[in-house]
Amino acid sequence: MDLQKLRKQLEIDEGVKYEVYKDHLGYSTFGIGHLVTSHDPEYGWSVGTDVDEDRVIAAFEQDCQSVLQDCSILYEDFDDLPEEVQQVIANMMFNMGRPRLSKFKGMKRGVDARDWNAAADEMVDSGWYRQVTNRADRLVKRMREI
């Protein structure tokens, strides 16, 4: 998968911030949507504390590895899917995580059947779609164009 393309998408969808901030749920975050955990050196840092670009890139690369691993768990043939499908699924996984994306059973059936329109229809028929409409619209459009 083209990780540079995924990064560019996620910079649009998640934004990129070189400081610790609180996300919409109140969790400490930095970089490209990186959730700060107790394993991060930034754990306990105050909101507004600067994070350098190298650390943002390292956290993103670590997050990508985790996301791609989760994609392969959820979609056993993930690496065999068309690049654009991989990009859409990885973007959704980055946004929601495996527990939430695993609930998209109709989308998974569509992807497994290589029925991209059915997969897109299932993406639209979700609470996620209503929550992140602009992002979701872009991803649905991409899925339909495969």
Model-based region annotation:
Residues 18-21, 73-84, 122:
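Surface-exposed patches in mature extracellular/periplasmic domains of secreted proteins
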